[in-house]
Design a protein with these regions (language model features):
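Flexible, glycine-rich terminal cap/loop adjacent to redox cofactors
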Residues: 7-14, 18-35, 47, 51-58, ...
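Short hydrophobic core segments
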Residues: 7-9, 113, 132-143, 178, ...
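FAD-site-proximal beta/loop scaffold in flavoenzymes
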Residues: 156-171, 260-335
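Beta1/beta-strand and adjacent pyrophosphate-binding region of the FAD-binding site
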Residues: 1-12, 171-181
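Hydrophobic/small residue at the entry helix of a nucleotide-binding pocket
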Residues: 14, 38, 183
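Glycine-rich flavin
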Residues: 2-4, 20-27, 32-171, 199, ...
Length: 465
């Protein structure tokens, strides 16, 4: 029986990054993966969706080329090619992970891994054979899948999850998207840009409900302007395939009335369910709560030498969180002096148009925490770079503690803001105050100047407003 220092179940951004760091630390490492290397993120999530969204963005630019003084005639999208490009990008990235496994001398086992006694893993291989490996430490990073609701039973054809939404053979004429988190909003933007009639149904009273209220309002305004119908405080009560092969979606609306929408496709984007069934948790006595594995600050479960990271534990279900958790976990195992992860300094991004990026407290959260706050906001309509780019929607909003100047939160909506949020993450990590941001010279003309200007607005020193 082959033995390893570290065995990792799952090769998503939690699993494969952890494996590489473990190898760098001199630990003999193995990964068990039942599907493609890279997990959901590389194959069915973060990466292929961004490829789809880039195609949508290019198509939008061509549609509005006259605004830039350029005439384009007889253009159209090829939906099959858009999907094919996305799949090719995913395959390329998965091959890249395979290369990294070989480079770092990490052994990859292709099959379904189940925890067994004495820190062993029983692997049901793709060829039907079974073998067993042992590890000194075992890290569970099996990720999650699309969650189903009773009224939204997915059939893979008419009522679908995010996987099917990425690989539809034909572009639907209309689609109802249930849920307005990152997944729902990104697909809403993509399909709307492609020419599909989109309706968003959100149970809570605003879209992207985890974001600052001002962000939700700005995004809703932009989506409606582009023809997307939005039903907030609404709930899907029933779905039924009708005689024409479409779906009748019965919705209880905010007024308390019901309405039925006839649509080709329903996309369920109501969250995720962890992949922790049938992997041996119960047999070993590993504790779970509400679909999550219970862990300490350094990701060890209640059973010694068993760890869990990523979507299977409490916290934000984000790729970069899983990677950070995995690195911290394995460094702790290797004997390094590490500090627990600061979950209040995790950035979140939504890649619609305009993009959304945020970190830290929203304004409401800061007030509820008891802070006296300074708030600054700078609109991209006052940004030279945004005006020159023809993308002047949105703003940057910053929140500071009035007493000590702590940077409590930063919230952005606009073109390219997902590439700007790192300034706030680094600033908050280094305990930067607003005064230090103001003294840091920002290049002109850039979108990132809006961060400095928003901070200036919080301190009543804004120049370009």
């Amino acid at each position: 029986m082959e033995k390893f220092d570290i065995i990792i179940l799952g090769s998503g951004p939690g699993g494969y990054v952890t494996a590489i760091r473990a190898s760098q630390l001199g630990l003999k490492t193995a990964i068990v993966e039942k599907e493609s290397l890279g997990g959901v993120c590389l194959n069915w999530g973060c990466i292929p969706t961004k490829a789809l969204l880039k195609s949508a963005q290019v198509f939008e630019y061509i549609k509005h080329s006259e605004e830039y003084g350029i005439s384009v005639e007889n253009f159209d999208k090829n939906f099959d090619n858009v999907v094919a490009r996305s799949r090719n990008v995913a395959k390329t990235m998965s091959k890249g992970v395979n290369f990294l496994m070989k480079k770092n001398k990490i052994k990859v086992f292709k099959g379904f891994g189940k925890l067994s006694e004495n820190k062993s893993i029983i692997i049901s291989n793709q060829d039907g054979s079974v073998n067993t490996i042992m590890g000194e430490k075992i890290i569970i990073a099996t990720g999650a899948r699309s969650r189903e609701l009773p009224a939204l039973k997915q059939d893979g054809k008419n009522i679908i999850g995010y996987r099917e939404a990425m690989t539809l053979k034909n572009q639907p004429k209309d689609i109802v998207i249930v849920g307005s988190g990152a997944i729902g909003i990104e697909f809403a933007y993509f399909y709307n840009s492609m020419g599909t009639k989109v309706t968003i149904v959100e149970f809570l009273d605003r879209i992207v409900p985890a974001e600052d209220v001002d962000i939700s309002k700005e995004l809703e305004k932009n989506l409606k302007k582009n023809g997307i119908e939005i039903l907030t405080s609404s709930e899907v009560k029933k779905t039924e395939i009708n005689e024409s092969g479409n779906v009748d979606v019965l919705i209880k609306t905010s007024s308390g009335d019901t309405k039925t929408i006839n649509t080709e496709i329903v996309l369920s984007a109501v969250g995720i369910k962890t992949n922790i069934e049938n992997i041996g948790l119960e047999e070993l006595g590993i504790k779970t709560e509400k679909d999550k594995i219970l862990i300490d600050d350094f990701y060890m479960t209640n059973i010694k030498d068993y760890y869990a990271i990523g979507d299977v534990v409490k916290g934000q279900a984000l790729a970069h969180v899983a990677s950070a958790e995995g690195i911290l976990c394995v460094e702790k195992i290797a004997g390094h002096d590490v500090n627990p992860l600061d979950y209040n300094n995790i950035p979140g991004c939504t890649y619609c148009s305009p993009e959304i990026a945020s970190v830290g407290y929203t304004e409401d959260q800061a007030i509820k925490k008891g802070y006296e706050i300074k708030v600054g906001k700078f609109p991209f309509s006052a940004s030279g770079k945004a005006q020159a780019s023809g993308k002047n929607e949105g703003f940057v909003k910053v929140i500071f503690d009035s007493k000590y100047g702590e940077w409590l939160g930063c919230h952005m909506i606009g073109d390219g803001v997902t590439d700007m949020i790192a300034e706030a993450v680094v600033g908050r990590k280094l305990e930067t105050t607003g005064n230090e941001i103001l003294k840091a010279v920002h290049p002109h003309p850039t979108m990132s100047e809006a961060v400095m200007e928003a901070v200036a607005a919080a301190y009543d020193e804004v120049i370009h407003l």
